[in-house]
């Protein structure tokens, strides 16, 4: 390779690297944040302690506050035998946290005028009827939402898994005429069947399957691209393996399940996807604001339920602490989602074991992060030095301009025959050393998030850096590469003697 070609190759590589880094930084919006190492270690200690106490194989945990992701991280293993670590993309069965999607879908259909919350269930499910004290009773959609229909919580326990009754329509026929525990509207009794019936109403009103309607009208618009519904016990690449404890040892568990229970229990999702759901719940777009607020509104009193005053549309509520939340439990999975719309934060814990330590962990995180401890973020610390970063930006911009002027002048001199390219082995060696320096700098930059923060990569870090730091970083990188270009120009050119 000639010196001239090497020179132009060096310049091209440097320019391309600088431009690509600048574009990548600019295109990332400030939607996430990152806890400092000390804060991260404190959070990790709390999480790992509770997971260990509960013998939980793996969990993924999400914390969102003020529209930013404070934490989205996996702990332990999604598959213990294969040593596959849990991550934000690991999908778990979220059990009863499916109900909030079902409830919101019903409210949206009511808003559109396609049903009325005071409609009798039998209006949309013609064959449906149930009795109280031997007399037929009318149950409304609102009573299903509020869990006050009187339908027993164990109504399907004697026929838990059958092929015959494995569809929504079939199971409602199977319980038709059964006895209610309470007169509709009088008492709260939590029953999955309430939300399974709501799923059937969604199907009958929209003429779509429940899963297809939720996917088309909620999951896709919310960019929850990897969220699905359980169809079999087969596990794909990103699906967590469910476990049950035998003594203190988690063992793989694949219990049978009912497809008709999908609207109340069988969504499969990750903290990566739930980030969109949590942000939507806390800060909904204007056209959905009233709908989301309605879904958090109390519908029934829940006397006897721990930490809850009332039940809303797929959520428990605690008015004293302004909390909206729900737990989810299956034989081999558990989940907990907690929202505080007033203080604008949300916590999600997904685990591949049914464990009482999941709600305990959420409680600990809620107490530690919000009420007592002041956890610092990298962004909050960097924000204290905005003025200094602005000065760096000005200085680096000046250096870039000087480098540009010098390079342009050198190009003009070359065009008019006032400079020549140097040709020597020493120059070639220096050029290769310059290229090696560029590569070394690129590798250091690539590893910088890990060296400073202990994990994460640029794609994550660049989403939460304050704009002042982004500008300082962009200009510093371009100034660095511009300086290398100037060095190359000095190495490769000399002024002709007149």
From Swiss-Prot:
InterPro entries: Bact_CellWall_Synth/Modif, Beta-lactam-related, Beta-lactam/transpept-like. The keyword Membrane applies. It is a multi-pass membrane protein. GO terms for cellular component: plasma membrane. It is found in: Cell membrane. SUPFAM superfamilies: beta-lactamase/transpeptidase-like. The chain crosses the membrane at residues 6-26, 389-409, 433-453, 471-491. The keyword Transferase does not apply. It holds the Pfam family Beta-lactamase. Keywords: Cell membrane, Membrane, Transmembrane, Transmembrane helix. Its main location: membrane. PANTHER family: D-ALANYL-D-ALANINE-CARBOXYPEPTIDASE/ENDOPEPTIDASE AMPH, PENICILLIN-BINDING PROTEIN 4. Its precise function is unknown. Has no penicillin-binding activity and is not involved in methicillin resistance. Has two of three conserved motifs typically found in penicillin-binding proteins (PBPs) and beta-lactamases, but no penicillin-binding activity has been detected. This is Protein flp. It comes from Staphylococcus aureus (strain MSSA476). The lineage of its organism: Bacteria, Bacillati, Bacillota, Bacilli, Bacillales. The gene is flp.
């Amino acid at each position: 390779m000639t010196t001239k070609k090497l020179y132009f190759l060096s310049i091209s590589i440097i320019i391309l690297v600088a431009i690509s880094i600048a574009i990548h930084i600019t295109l990332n919006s400030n939607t996430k944040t990152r806890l400092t190492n000390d804060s991260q270690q404190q959070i990790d200690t709390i999480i790992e302690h509770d997971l260990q106490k509960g013998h939980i194989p793996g969990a993924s945990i999400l914390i969102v506050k003020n529209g930013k992701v404070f934490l989205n991280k996996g702990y332990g293993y999604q598959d213990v035998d294969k040593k596959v670590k849990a991550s934000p993309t690991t999908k778990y069965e979220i059990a009863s946290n499916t109900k909030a999607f079902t409830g919101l879908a019903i409210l949206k259909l009511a808003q559109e005028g396609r049903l009325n919350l005071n409609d009798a269930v039998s209006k949309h499910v013609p064959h449906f009827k149930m009795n109280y004290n031997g007399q037929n009773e009318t149950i409304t959609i609102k009573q299903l939402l509020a869990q006050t229909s009187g339908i027993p919580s164990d109504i399907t326990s004697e026929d838990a898994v059958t092929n015959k009754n494995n569809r929504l329509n079939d199971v409602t026929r199977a319980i038709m005429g059964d006895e209610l525990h309470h007169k509709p509207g009088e008492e709260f009794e939590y029953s999955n069947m309430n939300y399974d019936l709501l799923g059937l109403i969604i199907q009958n009103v929209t003429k779509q399957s429940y899963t297809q309607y939720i996917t088309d009208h909620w999951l896709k618009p919310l960019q929850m691209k990897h969220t699905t519904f359980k169809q079999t016990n087969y596990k794909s690449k990103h699906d967590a393996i469910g476990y049950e404890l035998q003594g203190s040892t988690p063992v793989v568990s694949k219990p049978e399940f009912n497809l008709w229970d999908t609207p109340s229990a069988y969504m499969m999702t990750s903290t990566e996807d739930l980030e969109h759901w949590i942000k939507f719940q806390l800060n909904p777009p204007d056209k959905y604001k009233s709908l989301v607020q309605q879904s958090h509104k109390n519908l029934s009193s829940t006397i006897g339920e721990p930490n809850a005053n009332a039940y809303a549309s797929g959520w428990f509520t605690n008015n004293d602490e302004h909390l909206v939340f729900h737990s989810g439990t299956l034989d081999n999975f558990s989940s907990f989602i907690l929202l505080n719309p007033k203080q604008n934060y949300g916590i999600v814990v997904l685990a591949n074991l049914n464990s009482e330590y999941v709600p305990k962990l959420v409680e600990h995180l809620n107490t530690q992060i919000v009420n007592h401890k002041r956890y610092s973020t990298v962004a909050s610390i960097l924000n204290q030095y905005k003025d200094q970063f602005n000065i760096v930006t000005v200085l680096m911009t000046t250096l870039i301009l000087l480098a540009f002027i010098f390079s342009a002048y050198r190009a003009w001199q070359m065009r008019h025959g006032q400079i020549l390219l140097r040709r020597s082995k020493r120059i070639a060696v220096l050029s290769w050393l310059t290229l090696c320096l560029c590569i070394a700098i690129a590798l250091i930059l690539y590893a910088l998030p890990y060296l400073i923060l202990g994990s994460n990569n640029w794609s994550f870090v660049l989403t939460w850096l304050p704009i002042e730091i982004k500008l300082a970083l962009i200009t510093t990188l371009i100034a660095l590469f511009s300086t290398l270009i100037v060095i190359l120009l000095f190495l490769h050119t000399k002024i002709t003697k007149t």
